Amino acid sequence: MAAPQDVHVRICNQEIVKFDLEVKALIQDIRDCSGPLSELTELNTKVKEKFQQLKQRIQELEQSAREQDKESEKQLLLQEVENHKKQMLSNQTSWRKANLTCKLAIDNLEKAELLQGGDSLRQRKTTKESLAQTSSSITESLMGISRMMSQQVQQSEEAMQTLVSSSRTLLDANEEFKSMSGTIQLGRKLITKYNRRELTDKLLIFLALALFLATVLYIVKKRLFPFL
């Protein structure tokens, strides 16, 4: 049975992967965004929230790594933490580049609209719909993976709760066993003491009976054979 600490480490890793995929999906949406700026701002707000959640899980994993008893496991987890940090920095770089690309595309489209007028608006609408379809397809795929990871996280949490409940049951059973052991020891001592006392009582009865018989024989002897 896995230790609660191991289950927590596995949950952290799964959530880190989930948030990483969600960040990548949002960055792809930013790359495909052709405006307006309000849509870009909304996407950036979502990315910031996901980065905050990702950073928090990485910090939790790092704390769990430092609490490991075995040095080998500690170093292995710290290496995983370092890899996650590098991946997060890479995502942040991609995020900045995606913003630059999106803003440049918005600027170019606005300039084209001024030059081409109505034709540009129709072309922009068609381009935006095509990009939206592509983005939607990519986002659905990544979110599908994210949902799968969420289910795994939930299953791990349920396993952890079951583990904690089982641990409590074992502790209660251990306490009951200790109590029963004490009772058995006390009963054994009482039985031993009773057996000894019973033997002593039998010996005393035997001696009293022997003394009684000796007295009777002595009296009979004196009555029947006084000359002896």
From Swiss-Prot:
It holds the Pfam family Sec20. Keywords: Apoptosis, Coiled coil, Endoplasmic reticulum, ER-Golgi transport, Membrane, Mitochondrion, Protein transport, Transmembrane, Transmembrane helix, Transport, Ubl conjugation. Residues 221-228 are lumenal. GO terms for molecular function: calcium-induced calcium release activity; SNAP receptor activity. The keyword Oxidoreductase does not apply. It is a single-pass type IV membrane protein. The chain crosses the membrane at residues 200-220. The keyword Metal-binding does not apply. Component of a SNARE complex consisting of STX18, USE1L, BNIP1/SEC20L and SEC22B. Interacts directly with STX18, RINT1/TIP20L and NAPA. Interacts with ZW10 through RINT1. Interacts with BCL2. Interacts with RNF186. Interacts with RNF185. Interacts with SQSTM1; increased by 'Lys-63'-linked polyubiquitination of BNIP1. This is Vesicle transport protein SEC20. It comes from Mus musculus. The lineage of its organism: Eukaryota, Metazoa, Chordata, Craniata, Vertebrata.
